[in-house]
């Protein structure tokens, strides 16, 4: 079966694993999923990310992060730009998620960046997702 939106599938798998408090999540690898996972790690939303190479496309192993009392670090993830409706932001109109408490993941000419990094580099791009 052909998947029309692998990014939405990736975000949904993270959301579902987070809801039931799984420690580890494995998803089929792709370059954009690797980029999103690395941003989540860099911003402190997940503990660690491993890329496991195999004979096929590879697997991304995401280690989810929880607080001391088991509270979720990722409250929600939302896909913004979809295959049927692409959403772009100019460098001056970069979105802020919950007044800076969350992040927007932006696909730019310089690769995947957070909204803050895109503002610093003065670039716009496609708004992939919001994470808070």
From Swiss-Prot:
Q: Which cysteines are disulphide-bonded? A: none
- Endpoints of the signal sequence: none
What keywords are annotated for this sequence in UniProt?
A: Ribonucleoprotein, Ribosomal protein, RNA-binding, rRNA-binding
GO CC: one term? ribonucleoprotein complex
GO molecular-function terms, A-Z = rRNA binding; structural constituent of ribosome
State if Acetylation is listed as a keyword. Answer: no
User: Which InterPro entries did the record assign?
Assistant: Ribosomal_uS8 (IPR000630), Ribosomal_uS8_CS (IPR047863), Ribosomal_uS8_sf (IPR035987)
Pfam families from the UniProt entry: Ribosomal_S8
Q: Which GO terms describe its biological process?
A: translation
Q: Which domain of life is it from?
A: Bacteria
Q: Which family does it belong to?
A: Belongs to the universal ribosomal protein uS8 family.
SUBUNIT field: Part of the 30S ribosomal subunit. Contacts proteins S5 and S12.
Q: What does this protein do?
A: One of the primary rRNA binding proteins, it binds directly to 16S rRNA central domain where it helps coordinate assembly of the platform of the 30S subunit.
NCBIfam families to which the protein is assigned, alphabetical: PRK00136.1
**What's the protein name?**
Small ribosomal subunit protein uS8
- The species is Streptococcus pyogenes serotype M49 (strain NZ131)
Its lineage opens with: Bacteria, Bacillati, Bacillota, Bacilli, Lactobacillales
The encoding gene: rpsH
């Amino acid at each position: 079966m052909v998947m029309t939106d692998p990014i939405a599938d990736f975000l949904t798998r993270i959301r579902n694993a987070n809801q039931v408090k799984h420690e580890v999540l494995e998803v089929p690898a792709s370059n954009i999923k690797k980029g999103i996972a690395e941003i989540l790690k860099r911003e402190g939303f997940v503990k660690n990310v491993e890329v496991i190479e195999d004979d096929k496309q590879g697997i991304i192993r995401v280690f989810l992060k929880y607080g001391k009392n088991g509270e979720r670090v990722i409250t929600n993830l939302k896909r913004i730009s979809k295959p049927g409706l692409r959403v772009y932001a100019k460098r001056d109109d970069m979105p802020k998620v919950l007044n800076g408490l969350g992040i927007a993941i932006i696909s730019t000419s310089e690769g995947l960046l957070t909204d803050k990094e895109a503002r610093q580099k003065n670039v716009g791009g496609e708004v992939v997702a919001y994470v808070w």
